Design a protein with these regions (language model features):
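Generic low-polarity alpha-helical segments
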Residues: 9, 71, 79-81
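Conserved active-site "lid/cap" helical segment
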Residues: 35-77, 87-100
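Claisen-condensing/thiolase-fold acyl-transfer catalytic domains that form or cleave C-C bonds
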Residues: 59, 77-157
Length: 157
């Protein structure tokens, strides 16, 4: 695992043109035995089961988000996933027809930095976002929990 931290600054007085228009979160506790940190031991996971699960859930979440914006220009949609495994991310992007240039990631530079991964990618690209853009975040993480979010960039003012 890499080392990373992220922070969000929120304001009730300064308006923003960037806002989340959709967010869902869920988990699959019945698969508890696939990712385990025993009381007296080390992190252990069933790699094949977890990888397959991550690909399916990331792809499903991404497709769910894209279904919310069917008329959006595909050149204005960007994808960010959990930064644990570049192969998982690339597979999900390909299955959802996201062009490589629209798949943002940094796992190749920093490794798996846990829950700071996706926010750090968003932070790296924040100033590139323009009105009419969308960022689809589909994240699968520890505890076999997943979330999908749609960040919409509206016109200024």
């Amino acid at each position: 695992f890499g080392d990373c931290a992220t922070a969000s600054i929120l304001s009730v007085t300064i308006p923003s043109n960037k806002y989340f228009t959709d967010c869902e979160m869920d988990s699959r506790p019945t698969m508890w035995d696939k990712v385990v940190v025993p009381r007296w031991g080390y992190f252990n996971q069933d790699g094949n089961a977890v990888q397959g699960y991550a690909i399916r859930k990331t792809t499903d979440g991404l497709r769910n988000i894209l279904a919310l914006i069917p008329d959006a220009d595909p050149t204005r949609i960007f994808f960010i996933g959990h930064q644990a495994n570049l192969g998982v991310l690339q597979t999900a992007a390909e299955r959802a027809n996201i062009a490589p240039a629209h798949h943002w990631f940094n796992v190749d530079q920093y490794g798996n930095v846990g829950c700071a991964g996706a926010p750090s990618v968003l932070s790296q690209h924040w100033d590139e976002l323009r009105p009419g853009d969308y960022v689809a975040l589909s994240i699968v993480g520890a505890g076999l929990t997943w979330t999908q979010m749609l960040l919409t960039i509206a016109a200024e003012g």
